Amino acid sequence: MIYFHDIDPIALSLGPIKVHWYGIMYLLGFTAAWLLGRKRIADGRLPGVDANGFSDLLFYAMLGVVLGGRIGYMLFYALGDFLHNPLLLFKVWDGGMSFHGGLLGVIAACWWWSRKHKLHFFDTMDFMAPLVPLGLGFGRIGNFIGAELWGKYTDGSWGVVFPSGLPAPLNQLDHATLQAQFATGALNQFARHPSQLYEALLEGLVMFVVLWAVSAKPRHRYLVGGLFALMYGLFRFAVEFVRMPDNGVYVAFDWLTRGQILSLPLIAFGLVLLVMSRRAPVLQPQLPVAAEGKA
């Protein structure tokens, strides 16, 4: 059954303060990462690091997500606007975050933290990888609620009519008028793939289940990080075929998107890590010892 998107992106208004669902999804993602990370620390999945050390790591990773995500968006998707007005970088309330930029931010944070605590960088990355997918899933749900990053037209019964995705002059009509037209079936031809939910399922739920299961037992170094990079790259590349290209423009061949181009290095990197893991040592869980100074 085709759905008419009429969800208010603002979850709560407190006078001049507006709490957006997208922000709540970020909070849920960070909360999930904190809870899951503490469980993995208690199970000895990052030897020598206790709960305090993990909280320190997560703090820097969160900074990497936000700063890297915003900077990445401006560089990858809005470079012209950024060069014209660099202050746009700080207008986070206008939206605009890049997963690939956020990933680079997390990598930088984990590299710095690992070096500070004299831990193998990829042990840290393997530890963090299973904590990320649920946050990705929540973020894509936030995209859906905010009616952004929608897909291409579909005649499937699961399509969604996004008012902001309607062509002119329909996108100028008031909400009540659009609902009345939708009730007659007049807008069904403009139903789109809910690509945000596809990504929430694949990059969120499926990746979490796989990575959590693999990381819950002894495994070779590089394996979990390699699976993360490979799976995200493949899932993102695939969903981009039914998702509208950024700014409505293809990069090449009238089908290749910027998101697909940015995903290709991830796929290659994931494959390299999986090959490296075959000769890497097997990591065994070790319960944290606060006295070791990794706090």
Swiss-Prot record:
Q: How does it sit in the membrane?
A: Multi-pass membrane protein
**Keyword set, alphabetical order:** Cell inner membrane, Cell membrane, Membrane, Transferase, Transmembrane, Transmembrane helix
- Where in the sequence is the signal peptide annotated? none
What does the record give under GO molecular function? phosphatidylglycerol-prolipoprotein diacylglyceryl transferase activity
Q: To which pathway does this protein belong? A: Protein modification; lipoprotein biosynthesis (diacylglyceryl transfer)
Q: Which Pfam families match?
A: LGT (PF01790)
EC number(s) per entry: 2.5.1.145
Which of this chain's residues are annotated to bind a 1,2-diacyl-sn-glycero-3-phospho-(1'-sn-glycerol)?
A: R140
Family classification? Belongs to the Lgt family.
* The protein, known as: Phosphatidylglycerol--prolipoprotein diacylglyceryl transferase
Q: Which organism is it from?
A: Stenotrophomonas maltophilia (strain R551-3)
Gene that encodes the chain: lgt
